[in-house]
Amino acid sequence: MPQSLTKILVHIVFSTKHRADLITPEVEPNLHAYLGGICRELDSPLVAVNGTPNHIHMLVNLGRTVSVSDLLLNVKRDSSKWMKTKSSNFSDFHWQDGYGAFSISESAVPRLQDYIANQKERHAALTFEDELRALCRKYNVTLDERYSWS
């Protein structure tokens, strides 16, 4: 085959450092748009994004020449720098070191889009830690909690 064809859908989750509630309603829409721009620059269109004051969920169609780790390196580095320019309240803004990244099938996209869209309602009764534990169980990923909450 003379061309490379891919469709790699990835559900990505990461939090602010120490799960600090730093993503305010005022900055959230612009942050989401900025995340979309970073993904677009890496030929990895953002299909859905949402979150809470302390974490982000993204559904990304991963580009054929970018790895998940390279995508997240750029997303977290660039958006952290951007956040720090928005207000002195964000001068200490950092993302956590790690992330969760889970492959999903095309048939799961509508359900995941709903899941991402309803983050604030979901977290009225669920912590980020409990959500990540549930996602790891769902996707059969081993979670070592000694390294998961920094």
Predicted features by range, described:
Residues 1-150:
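Basic nucleic-acid-binding interfaces
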